[in-house]
Amino acid sequence: MLAVNEQEFELTDKDFKFIQWFMHKTVGIYLPDSKRTMVYGRLSRQMRRKGLRRFTQFRELIESDEQERIHFINTLTTNKTEFFRESHHFEFIEKVLVPEWSKERVGQLRFWSAGCSTGEEPYTLVSVLDHAGVMNFCPDIKIWATDLDTAVLEKASLGIYPIESQSSIPERYLRRCFVRGVKDQQGNMKIKQSLQRYIDFHQLNLIQEWPFKQKLDLILCRNVMIYFDRPTQEQLIERFHQQLKPGGVLMLGHSESVGRCSSLFHHLGHTVYVRQ
């Protein structure tokens, strides 16, 4: 049995500095020194499975093997989400944006859930669009849902969740947009396939090139930028601005803002920003 403060694996200061450098260089994520215990805890589980004793052995793997690199990044990324998280954003979509789109009789709508994790955010969005009747007046709707972590994307693409997840979903959406699992899926629930078809899930590193060929009507990037340093955040905000249509909307997490890029947007409150 290990004594208190005794570590099972060696993680030197040099090792941790490498991890900080690697995560920032590769995916833009800033890991402050205060995250060292978290990093050690997550990596130690992986090292135990691989039969490694020192992080230098792990480093050799991620430097030589692309799949190991991806798995390493997945291990250190945080994926906390739920249906209708920060519900005021979805109320704004249904009560403000949808009436505007309907009045303008838009024929095409493009959305992006950036940092979609296990899929609750894009599925919430499509549920709101369906409940508000957007599909009745707009024939061409597409939601791109992206994340860095390939493991969470695999789960998201299935659209299957424990029945306990319904606790955060208002009843009117739950009845209309989800079905309960039966037989081997008993105890689970699933987004209806008729809604799932509007969503495309893809792996994407936010600090690399984006694949979009069209300007977007709405970007949801909530509680993602908190993991980036200030220069990276500002670069992303500028790129979001360029990717949005004039009048397009950017929604950020409750503790995030556009910072020094405020001249690019009109702030409507509650971390809702309209492209100038």
UniProtKB/Swiss-Prot annotation:
It catalyses: L-glutamyl-[protein] + S-adenosyl-L-methionine = [protein]-L-glutamate 5-O-methyl ester + S-adenosyl-L-homocysteine. GO terms for molecular function: protein methyltransferase activity; protein-glutamate O-methyltransferase activity. It holds the Pfam family CheR. Gene3D superfamilies: Chemotaxis receptor methyltransferase CheR, N-terminal domain (1.10.155.10), Vaccinia Virus protein VP39 (3.40.50.150). Keywords: Methyltransferase, S-adenosyl-L-methionine, Transferase. GO terms for biological process: chemotaxis; methylation. Its EC number is 2.1.1.80. It is an enzyme of class 2 (transferase). Residues 4-276 form the CheR-type methyltransferase domain. It comes from the Bacteria. Disulfide bonds: none annotated. S-adenosyl-L-methionine binds at N79, T81, R85, E121, D147, N205, L206, R222, N223. One of its GO terms (cellular component) is methyl accepting chemotaxis protein complex. Signal peptide: none annotated. Methylation of the membrane-bound methyl-accepting chemotaxis proteins (MCP) to form gamma-glutamyl methyl ester residues in MCP. This is Chemotaxis protein methyltransferase 3.
